[in-house]
Amino acid sequence: SIGSKERTPELRNPKLSTGGLVESNSARPVPQVRIEIPQYISVPGTKRWLHIKGHLAYGTFTDNNWQEDFARSGNLYTKDVLYHSKSFFMKVGKKESFPLELEAGLQMAAQFGGKQYVEGQKEPIMTMPSDFMDFIRVLIPMSGSDNAMEGEQINKYGNHVGSWNIGPVS
């Protein structure tokens, strides 16, 4: 899908939770291009004992210039920050044959790219890289290129968050 769309976070029970560790419904949806398998599908050859679902998305954060309006003189704000998220979940079990089903998976999101400004100045003081290889560096978390900040050359490029989710199917 393409665009801004409200989505329920993976494995979230709306009766028990306000959100997950990686994503929640408490913020405006991020405009994105997203490829997904939203519901579990059976893996061929497993006699319906193994199912998978997941997604891969890239987008951009928007704030209707809120940061520019809110930032006090001399303070920093960032524009044109990019977004990446991905998930992969497996469900093992077959309710018709055995009463217990388990699901497990990984969910990750990252912020990267963008330009940092000082309130009152037109030119950015820092531009984070966002070429094709930077999209790959976020997809498969790896260190940044030579034009990334030093900390992101040593560690991973972008601000990554993620969670492993394991539990019985409710």
PLM feature segments, named:
Residues S1-I2, V33-Q39, F88-K94, P168-S170:
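Residues on the lipid-exposed face of transmembrane beta-strands in outer-membrane beta-barrel proteins
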Residues I2-E6, I52-T60, L102-A110:
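Transmembrane beta-barrel strands of outer-membrane/channel proteins
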Residues S4-P14, T18-Q32:
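Aromatic-lined, polymer-binding surfaces characteristic
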Residues R12-G19, N64-S73, K115-G120:
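Outer-membrane beta-barrel translocator domains and adjoining extracellular loop/strand segments
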Residues T18-E23, R72-L76, I154-Y157:
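Extracellular loop and loop/strand-boundary signature of outer-membrane beta-barrel proteins
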Residues S24-V30, K47, K79-S85, N159-I166:
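Transmembrane beta-barrel outer-membrane domains
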Residues Y40-G54, K91-E103:
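Short loop/turn motifs that connect adjacent beta-strands in outer-membrane beta-barrel proteins
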Residues L102-A104, F112-S170:
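Long, internal scaffold/assembly segments composed of regular secondary structure
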